[in-house]
């Protein structure tokens, strides 16, 4: 097992991406992927999977604060299922509540408003999702 994981923060216009290592329980952002109504360029995802050869892909599951599902929840689950179906990689859905809030706060702390562009926030959210998964799983 490689100990490498990819994390995705699913969105309809942008999908945040992060790569992390189980041994250090840390992740770092990769460039966010553009999406059209939630549909990414699958060739780019294939390249990411070939480059990083992750043990599993962690996809953030957007839930309401009370734990109930919202309209985006089913779309994120569908995105995860498509990754598994197309590429055969193991998928884990991970609760992403407050990941965007935490990501925005961290980016603002390090770069003010200039750091809060959409792609940066989405990939920083993917980092939060992945590191949260590591904390809860290992």
From Swiss-Prot:
GO cellular component, as recorded: cytosol
EC number: 3.1.-.-
GO annotation (BP), single: rRNA 5'-end processing
InterPro entries referenced in this protein's UniProt entry, alphabetically: RNaseH-like_sf (IPR012337), YqgF (IPR005227), YqgF/RNaseH-like_dom (IPR006641), YqgF/RNaseH-like_dom_sf (IPR037027)
Major place of residence: cytoplasm
UniProt keyword list: Cytoplasm, Hydrolase, Nuclease, Ribosome biogenesis
EC class: hydrolase
KW Cytoplasm (keyword) present: yes
CDD domains linked to this entry: YqgF
Cystine residue pairs: none
One term of GO molecular function: nuclease activity
Domain of life of the native organism: Bacteria
Signal peptide (UniProt feature, chain positions): none
Keyword Hydrolase assigned: yes
Compartments, record wording: Cytoplasm
Function (record text): Could be a nuclease involved in processing of the 5'-end of pre-16S rRNA.
Family membership: Belongs to the YqgF nuclease family.
Name of the protein described by the UniProt record: Putative pre-16S rRNA nuclease
Species of origin: Klebsiella pneumoniae (strain 342)
